[in-house]
Each structure stands twice: as structure tokens, then as C-alpha cells.
Amino acid sequence: MTDTHVPPPELPAAEEGEERPHRRIKSFVMRAGRMTEGQQRGLDQGRPLFGLSLTDTPVDFDQVFGRSAPRTLEIGFGMGHSLLEMAAASPEQDFIGVEVHYPGVGAMLNGVLTQGLTNVRVYDCDAIEVLNRCIADNSLDRLMLFFPDPWHKSRHHKRRIVQPEFAALVRSKLKVGGVFHMATDWGPYAEYMLEVMSVAPGYRNQAEDNQYVPRPAERPITKFERRGEKLGHGVWDLKFEKVD
């Protein structure tokens, strides 16, 4: 079955003398993809149980999960392998995943069903909308951004999700002491992330040399990362703690 989730239509042309509505530059591009049986099962059976929708007011996640627990949000979980592994390893913590591509959402939810996890919830929409509308200020213990699209070409750098405005938004959602954890396998993007975050107010770099941290034990190594290591590709982890 093909993915039926499509991007919103283009804005209509403005009438003469009419001001065009502002349109935020997005850091992702919707891609159609074929769904496996398992992914479709995840969407059909898992989304009613573990899927969340955009709201106009912050969500009470204590009510959603039925408890108060340390809470992590991951933006762009891909096929969900890392988030599933972390959630299974830490049942005492709650995990919120955000991903726009339906095959990945289906795979993640199928994994939640198969493993019998209860500490995971999933959004299948724009992460910026989720942060702005659904996540209360000062509520997250950790926000993870692993291997986001580096948008290699200079003219596309404005599409990179890590920007000063994004750093400020993440900071507003983290508790004091909460951590923004990023990872990338693209050296120039690692440098760009470091440059943005080093001047972002209210953060402290957890690296001893104010650069990159060694790969944290809690971040699972993906098959993609293992292949890259064999080819001599590097991976850079950055951890910035909210200090005020």
C-alpha cells in the first residue's frame, strides 16, 4: 500500500494589493513511500492507542502516561529503532517521538505493539508545531535530534532545523538541567550546530573542551552508523544543558 499522506497544498496566489501570508521554511520534505504489512499494522492498530494529535493547548502528559516520570522527546525518529531501544531499556521513563514520514511512524508503532511498550507516544506531524502547541514550557528532561537532514547545499542551509530560533524554542520546553542532545554524521553540520548552540542564551556545553562529547552510552548505534564507521565516517554528538 502506498503512503497517502501528502504535503499541504501550495498557498493560493495573492490578489493584487493583497499581502501574502507568511510561510515558515520547513526543515523536511514529505516523501511518498510504500508501506509494509507491519508498518500498516502499526498505523491501523497502534495509532489509536499510542498516536497523538496536535492540540491548541499544552498536553498533560502525566495524564496521557498515567504517571509522572522523566520525559524525553525525539524529533525525527526515522524508523524508530533508537527510540524503541531506549524506551525498552528505560521503562521508568516516558518517550515522545515525532516523525512526519508514515512508513517510519508505522514501523515505530508496530514496534511498540510487538514489544508491548507502554511508555511511548507518537506524533506524525511537524515537530515545530508539536513544540509550539502541545509541549508545556519547562516540562522536558531531554530533547533528542539524531542525524537530521544536513541540507548540504549552501542555498538550503536555511532549511536546517538547528537555528537560533529553534535553540530558543527547545530551551523554553526543557526543564532547568534538561539536555538538548544532537548527533550528526556530517562534519560541516556538526560545526554549524556547535556554532549556533555555543552562542544560544541559557545553555552550557557539557563537553569538557566545549566542543563535542564522546558518544553517550544511552544513544544506540544504528546499522547506518556502523556502516559509516567501517568506511571511516565520523559521528559527532553535542549535548547542551539548559542552565536558566
Swiss-Prot record:
**Where on the tree of life does the source sit, at the highest rank?**
Bacteria
Chemical reaction(s) catalysed: guanosine(46) in tRNA + S-adenosyl-L-methionine = N(7)-methylguanosine(46) in tRNA + S-adenosyl-L-homocysteine
| Record-linked Pfam families | Methyltransf_4
Annotated S-adenosyl-L-methionine binding lies at 74, 99, 126, 149
Q: Which InterPro entries match?
A: SAM-dependent_MTases_sf, tRNA_(Gua-N-7)_MeTrfase_Trmb, tRNA_methyltr_TrmB_bact
Q: Where is this region: Disordered?
A: 1-23
Q: What EC number(s) has UniProt assigned to this enzyme?
A: 2.1.1.33
Which leading EC class covers this enzyme? transferase
Under SUPFAM superfamilies, the record lists:
S-adenosyl-L-methionine-dependent methyltransferases (SSF53335)
GO MF term (any one): tRNA (guanine(46)-N7)-methyltransferase activity
- Keywords attached to this entry: Methyltransferase, S-adenosyl-L-methionine, Transferase, tRNA processing
The cross-references to Gene3D superfamilies, in alphabetical order and at most eight, read: Vaccinia Virus protein VP39
Bias class Pro residues marks the residues at 1-11
Record's GO cellular component terms: tRNA methyltransferase complex
User: Which pathway features in its UniProt record?
Assistant: tRNA modification; N(7)-methylguanine-tRNA biosynthesis
> Which catalytic residues are annotated?
149
Assigned protein family: Belongs to the class I-like SAM-binding methyltransferase superfamily. TrmB family.
The record, for NCBIfam families, names: tRNA (guanosine(46)-N7)-methyltransferase TrmB (TIGR00091)
Q: Which PANTHER family match?
A: 3-DEOXY-D-MANNO-OCTULOSONIC-ACID TRANSFERASE/TRNA GUANINE-N 7 - -METHYLTRANSFERASE, PENTACOTRIPEPTIDE-REPEAT REGION OF PRORP DOMAIN-CONTAINING PROTEIN
> Per its UniProt record, what HAMAP family does this chain match?
tRNA_methyltr_TrmB
- Name of the protein in its database record: tRNA (guanine-N(7)-)-methyltransferase
- Its source organism is Pseudomonas syringae pv. tomato (strain ATCC BAA-871 / DC3000)
